[in-house]
A protein has these predicted regions:
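Charged alpha-helix within mobile-element recombinases
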Residues: 19, 23, 197-204
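ATPase catalytic-site recognition across NTP-hydrolyzing enzymes
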Residues: 3-65
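A residue-level signal for conserved active-site and pocket-lining positions in enzyme catalytic cores
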Residues: 28, 66, 75, 124, ...
Length: 204
């Protein structure tokens, strides 16, 4: 990047703050770096985990949803602080595999409404492949935004937000915290020149 004379120092500084880990080595230093180890290596519980949520502006809530059949189904409730930082302030986590019982769309929608406890989210962001669950939520009056499915773009985006301190997690979201600390690159795929995460600890 430093070889690009068209970039001002201000822009270079912004780019440096956006990337970390393998993406920093590739995009900023111009090095080929294999994707290995912890994906969100910038995640720091001292910086990103909150015990006090008194600074939240409780007006516009959003829910992100990872809908699973065998894998876990997760709802995360997001709200902004006065500073503009987004905070994941509540989680719902249910693994049909661990509980040895799958739930229906109706049961998950009932769980969502109970979990929201009267909160009406602006939008629920959900994988477009969860078509039947989306239909159930729309029937109940929720506004749906279909999530983008590009995994690497999502990883880069979340890593950038973490690196710049623009998102944080409540300490009442133990599964989300665990997954941020446990999400790793697939080293066998990396040896073949393919960047992809291990399909584990990727639900929250």
């Amino acid at each position: 990047m430093d070889d690009n004379l068209s970039l001002s120092e201000k822009i270079k500084a912004r780019y440096r703050s956006m990337y970390t880990g393998v993406f920093y080595r590739r995009y900023i230093l111009g090095l080929w770096a294999m994707a290995e180890g912890i994906i969100y290596d910038m995640f720091d519980t001292a910086r990103h985990v909150l015990s006090n949520l008194s600074d939240l502006v409780n007006t516009n809530y959003y829910v992100s949803c990872d809908y699973g059949t065998q894998n876990a189904t997760v709802f995360l409730l997001w709200c902004k602080e006065r500073s503009g930082r987004w905070v994941c302030c509540r989680e719902y986590y249910y693994s049909g595999r661990d509980e040895e019982r799958q739930k229906t769309d109706t049961e998950y929608a009932d769980d969502l409404e109970q979990w929201l406890a009267g909160i009406k989210p602006v939008k629920i962001i959900i994988d477009p492949s969860a078509a039947s669950f989306i239909a159930e939520l729309k029937k109940r009056g929720y506004t749906i935004k279909k999530a983008k499915n590009d995994v690497l773009d999502g990883i880069r985006f979340v890593a950038s937000l973490l690196n710049q301190g623009e998102i944080a997690i409540s300490d009442q979201c133990p599964n989300t915290i665990k997954e941020f600390a446990s999400y790793i690159w697939d080293e066998k795929a990396a040896e073949q020149g393919v960047d992809k995460p291990v399909k584990q600890f990727d639900h929250a």
